[in-house]
């Protein structure tokens, strides 16, 4: 895992500043490439191999190619088979990737699977392409205005260029107030964008001409004739590739529990982490209790990280600032506290496994049950009548035959608190989802369609952005095996509507597969708290004071958002105002960090 940076041109000192701003992503080594058209930079977090073999940008004297790469590729065995015998003893994915580039040129992308953000430059063509992986696990940002083009793994890398236009993207602000984050390609800045999953940007460095397109990553046949249980074991074995120890975030839920089981099956040393919340309602530590019990049953070395109210408040501003984008998730400070304990300044882990991504493959969220129930109701009455009933009850104007409307109905955060009222517009979402749906939306099952919506809008737009920024701030690579694209495609083809949900709960197929392997207290549990901080219990005057201190400087702008109204919501309530307030707190933190008006 690393940080990649670059820009068109040869401005002295700029790449060094970009590398410096993103050094936390790769503290082991920094490198630079420059020719008359482009400057590229790289920060290395060494995971697989000795330092010298891992350094980037990758070049060869006789080759026109220059590579900067952030991520991990897991199909290294298949990559070796496509290269000559000189690569037979190579384990480093970067070396294998460069070998494929030399063999296949721009078509290399058809032969790799993993999580990645890639910058590839051809010196002879003066052409740059930047790529984001199909699941969106690795963010990649770019700035495009006039003859200027800059890209980086993080927004702060782009803002290292002092002249960058910081004009605000009002549409992105609207999305943040509707959803609590910004899905798709938008950021708070009009001229800074992020690549979407499966998107490639092509840049003619001589004429500064940009084209964008989507590539289809076809992983059919990846697992051959393997049965589902074999696929899980193979998946985890591939994701354990590392010269460093690999630990696991163990939540007590199905997804992380099955990862622990598969780690034990391949004989991997098991180190697990979970959170315990100080002085909170018993229900908030139910998951911690189960995780502790499961770790003991499997003989894992288990660490509990205690989250106190003081720690939460002390890390509040830093955690939301680290994400660089607005975020409504109330557990953001908890994630940072956890990453600090696990990472470079704590236990010095470099690789952590996470169960993220399983809910969007095996229908884990409660709203999937509701989607199926609504579909049954729509069959009983005509769609217009159904829409009328639901809209009258909720004061909205949705057409539930559209996946975007149905998704927004369940996923919307709160009515936006803006200076001027704005109505929901389906086009805001469909412009993001349609390219993705054209490649992967082959099944019409409403639960599957709901999972696709979550994959492209929420998982890539919120979850992976948050987890990447938080963990990389502590020089830790977070891997999410259950979001692996070949794994997704295998189960998307295998499962149907009847496999997702049963009367006893969601994840029907997964629970049945692991019954008899995992303990019943995991496979048969009907409730899961999730890693949610107990703010309703903790909230007091110290929270209110902090929240108001963050909002107060924003009152003088009042340009897009009604900050006065938000302040009143905090002032007038003795209880926690709700998760929507965290979206506005994060917007205020970022506005002050970036010196912009909202």
Label for each model-derived stretch:
Residues 1-323, 350, 516, 564, ...:
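Cysteine-centered catalytic environments shared across enzyme families
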Residues 501-523:
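Charge-dense polyanion-binding interfaces
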Residues 292-476, 522, 526, 548-551:
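Glycine-rich active-site loop/lid subdomains used to bind and stabilize high-energy intermediates
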Residues 77, 488-492:
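Short, solvent-exposed hinge/capping segments at secondary-structure junctions
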């Amino acid at each position: 895992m690393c940080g990649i940076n670059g820009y068109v041109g040869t401005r002295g000192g700029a790449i060094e500043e970009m590398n410096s701003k993103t050094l936390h992503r790769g503290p082991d080594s920094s490198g630079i490439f420059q020719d008359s058209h482009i400057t590229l930079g790289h920060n290395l977090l060494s995971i697989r191999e000795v330092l010298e073999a891992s350094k980037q940008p990758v070049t060869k004297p006789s080759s026109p190619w220059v590579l900067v790469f952030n991520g991990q590729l897991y199909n290294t065995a298949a990559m070796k088979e496509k290269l000559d015998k000189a690569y037979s003893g190579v384990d480093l994915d970067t070396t294998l990737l460069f070998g494929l580039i030399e063999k296949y040129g721009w078509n290399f992308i058809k032969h790799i699977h993993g999580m990645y953000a890639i910058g590839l430059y051809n010196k002879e063509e003066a052409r740059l392409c930047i790529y984001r992986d199909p699941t969106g696990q690795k963010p990649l940002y770019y700035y495009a205005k006039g003859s200027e083009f800059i890209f980086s793994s993080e927004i702060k890398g782009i803002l290292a260029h002092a002249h960058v236009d910081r004009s605000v993207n009002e549409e992105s602000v609207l999305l943040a107030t509707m959803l609590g984050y910004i899905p798709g390609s938008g950021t708070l800045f009009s001229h800074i964008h992020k690549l979407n999953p499966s998107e490639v940007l092509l840049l003619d460095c001589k004429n500064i001409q940009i084209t964008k397109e989507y590539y289809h990553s076809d992983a059919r046949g990846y697992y051959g004739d393997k049965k589902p249980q074999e696929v899980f074991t193979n998946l985890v074995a591939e994701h354990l590739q590392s010269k460093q120890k690999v630990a696991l975030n163990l939540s007590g839920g199905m997804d992380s529990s099955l990862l622990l089981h598969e780690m034990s099956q391949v004989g991997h040393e098991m180190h697990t982490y979970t959170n315990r919340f100080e002085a909170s309602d018993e229900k908030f530590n139910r998951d911690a209790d189960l995780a502790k019990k499961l770790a003991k049953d499997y003989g894992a070395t288990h660490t509990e990280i205690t989250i106190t109210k003081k720690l939460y408040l002390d890390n509040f501003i830093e955690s939301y600032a680290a994400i660089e984008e607005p975020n409504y998730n109330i557990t953001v400070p908890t994630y940072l506290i956890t990453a600090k304990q696990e990472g470079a300044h704590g236990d010095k882990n470099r690789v952590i496994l996470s169960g993220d991504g399983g809910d969007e493959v095996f229908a884990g969220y409660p709203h999937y049950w509701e989607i199926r129930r609504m579909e049954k109701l729509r069959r009983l009455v005509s769609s217009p009548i159904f829409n009328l009933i639901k809209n009258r009850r909720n004061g909205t104007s949705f057409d539930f035959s559209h996946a975007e409307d149905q998704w927004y109905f369940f996923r919307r955060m709160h009515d936006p608190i803006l200076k001027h009222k704005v109505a929901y517009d389906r086009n805001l979402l469909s412009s993001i989802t349609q390219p993705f749906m054209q490649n992967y939306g082959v099944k019409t099952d409403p639960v599957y369609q709901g999972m696709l919506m979550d994959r492209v809008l929420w998982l890539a737009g919120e979850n992976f952005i948050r987890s990447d920024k938080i963990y990389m701030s502590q020089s830790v690579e977070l891997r999410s095996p259950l979001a692996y694209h070949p794994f997704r495609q295998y189960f998307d083809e295998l499962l149907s509507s009847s496999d997702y949900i049963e009367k006893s709960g969601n994840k029907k197929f997964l629970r049945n597969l692991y019954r008899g392997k995992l303990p019943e207290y995991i496979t048969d549990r009907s409730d899961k708290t999730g890693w949610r901080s107990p703010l309703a219990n903790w909230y007091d005057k110290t929270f209110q004071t902090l929240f108001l201190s963050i909002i107060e400087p924003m009152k003088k702008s009042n340009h897009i958002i009604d900050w006065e109204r938000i302040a009143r919501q905090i002032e007038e309530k003795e209880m926690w105002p709700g998760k929507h307030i965290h979206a506005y707190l994060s917007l205020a933190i970022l506005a002050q960090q970036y010196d912009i008006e909202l």
